[in-house]
Structure formats: structure tokens, C-alpha cells
Amino acid sequence: MLHIRPSTRKQAKIKLALQGCAGSGKTYSALLLAYGMTSDWSKIAVIDSENGSADLYAHLGTYNVVSLGGDYSPENYIEAITLCENAGMEVIIVDSISQCWDYLLDFHANLQGNSFANWAKVTPRQNAFVQKILQSAVHIICTMRTKQDYVLNEKNGKMVPEKVGLKAMQRDGMDYEFTVVLDIDLKHHVQALSLIHISEP
């Protein structure tokens, strides 16, 4: 049954993405952001697909960890998010969602038959995962790995190769699903790539 209600700020839950190459500090930054949102480590959960990297920052506080155990299917991610919601978490960090896309690409590559037609077996699974994130009644921070390359930059009169992050390793257009997308470089500088503007009254 449909009903109408006045808008309230407490109804708005942020869906934030942090992207960067390995070593840029995505997990650490996500934890600090999550604590800034809730001020309670016990209300933060990290869904870990990075082989235990979530535990590297246990000195920050006693947050919760859900290990995906090597199963990076969208269904396992959805189950993990539901588990965190039911446990009363206020901020869920999904670290990282790139493994889910890698899983789906591998799944697609191993299907028999027409490659284009086979996307019909992949897209609904990805869409279900995305909708789970967007429809969750809690704040969600997702990390995404970026493809890496090297560029030459001048440093002290010499040309030095520096590693840079390029495109996020996820489905094209995934960045448009989030309220905010932040790119973190290896010097830990942050740039907003996508931002839904919310005007102050």
C-alpha cells in the first residue's frame, strides 16, 4: 500500500564509493569515514574480499568483519550485506566490489554459446547486487580497485615513473549509482569524481 510522508534528512543514507589503485589507502579511509558517520566502531562492519586486509586496522577500534571466504558471487555479497543489516550495523563497508565484477567476467567467459546473448545471464545478477546496495537502509561505503598504469613525472630535474590509477574495475557507469565517488591517489590525495549536490536551506 502506498503512502505519502514529509521528507526528513534522517531518511537519507549515503552510498559512497572510494576508488584507487593498490596502496592508496581505500580501506583505511573507508574506516575513518565510517567512524565519522556513526562515532561507534561497534556499528561498523567491513565485508572483506581482500584476504583479511580489513583486520590490518584493528588498532583503530573494534569494528566488525565479515569474510567472503573466496566466494565473490553477487549472491554472497548480497547475503553479507543482509547479515550486517540484520545485526544492526549503521555503516557497511564493502571492500571491495571489484572482486564481484571479476567473478562475473570470469563467469561470462566460461559460458557456452553467443557471447553477447550470454550477458543476459550476467546482468541481472549484477543489477541485483547494485540494487541491494542502493536500497539498503544503512550507509554503505564501497571500495573499487582501479586499473594501474605508469606516467613519467619530473622530480628534482629527473623524469621519474609514477604509478597512477585509471578506470575503476567495475561495470561501466557504476560510478553514477553512488551519492559520492572519491578517487584516492598514491599520495593519499582525494578528488571528488561524482557528487550529488545537496543545497543547504
Label each residue range with its predicted role:
Residues 1-9:
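Pre-Walker A adenine-sensing motif
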Residues 8-87, 91, 98-99:
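Conserved P-loop
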Residues 55, 190-193:
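Short active-site-adjacent structural elements
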Residues 91-172:
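P-loop NTPase motor core
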Residues 140, 179-183:
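Short, well-ordered beta-strand core segments
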Residues 184-189:
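Beta-strand-loop-alpha "switch" segments that mediate conformational coupling across diverse proteins
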Residues 194-201:
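Residue-level detector of conserved catalytic or cofactor/ligand-binding positions
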